[in-house]
């Protein structure tokens, strides 16, 4: 039997040590509770009860028979008209129809090599300019060659006419 009180004493000592550690933690974190260790929520509840004692009795759903209580009765609350607010919110929530022009090039399926053509297009522009210049130069050379042959043909025909007139 002597062991039982010693075990209880040890448990009480451990409980006191835990309380001290918790108190030290509360002080460290800045929480301030009552010294008797009651939690803060209990303190707030007790303070609320004190304030509640000083408030007047309000009767909302109870129809009293006593004249004194009838004076304390709260009138029926009228519901607030929310139809206008709801209509405004519904109108604000309606999405405005967005009409965009549809680009058929974006909708049509593309050929498998479209990206290659896009990449090569810049290089082809440079080559196209060179090609046009080369074609123009070839045409000029032919015209010069034809002018020379035309001039010789004209000279030849004039020479024959001169011979014929002799």
From Swiss-Prot:
For the modification N6-acetyllysine, which residues carry it?
Answer: 53
Here the disulfide bonds are none
PTM-bearing positions, type N-acetylmethionine: 1
- Give the coiled coil ranges: 8-28, 115-144
Modified positions (Phosphoserine) in chain numbering = 149, 165
Keyword list, A-Z? Acetylation, Coiled coil, Isopeptide bond, Phosphoprotein, Ubl conjugation
Q: Record's superkingdom?
A: Eukaryota
Region ranges (Disordered): 21-55, 146-166
This chain's protein is named Coiled-coil domain-containing protein 12
| Skewed-composition ranges (Basic and acidic residues) | 21-53
Q: Does the keyword Cytoplasm apply?
A: no
The UniProt record lists the Glycyl lysine isopeptide (Lys-Gly) (interchain with G-Cter in SUMO2) crosslink at: 94
From which source organism is this entry?
A: Mus musculus
């Amino acid at each position: 039997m002597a062991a039982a009180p010693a075990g209880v004493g040890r448990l009480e000592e451990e409980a006191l040590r835990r309380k001290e550690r918790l108190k030290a933690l509360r002080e460290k974190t800045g929480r301030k509770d009552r010294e008797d260790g009651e939690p803060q929520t209990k303190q707030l509840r007790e303070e609320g009860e004190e304030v509640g004692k000083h408030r007047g009795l309000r009767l909302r759903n109870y129809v009293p028979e006593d004249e004194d209580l009838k004076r304390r009765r709260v009138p029926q609350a009228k519901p607030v008209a929310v139809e206008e607010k709801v209509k405004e919110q519904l109108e604000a929530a309606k999405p405005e129809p967005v009409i965009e022009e549809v680009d058929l090039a974006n909708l049509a399926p593309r050929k498998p090599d479209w990206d290659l053509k896009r990449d090569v297009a810049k290089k082809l522009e440079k080559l196209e300019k060179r090609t046009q210049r080369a074609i123009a130069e070839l045409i000029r050379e032919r015209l010069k060659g034809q002018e020379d042959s035309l001039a010789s043909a004209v000279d030849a025909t004039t020479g024959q006419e001169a011979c014929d007139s002799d």
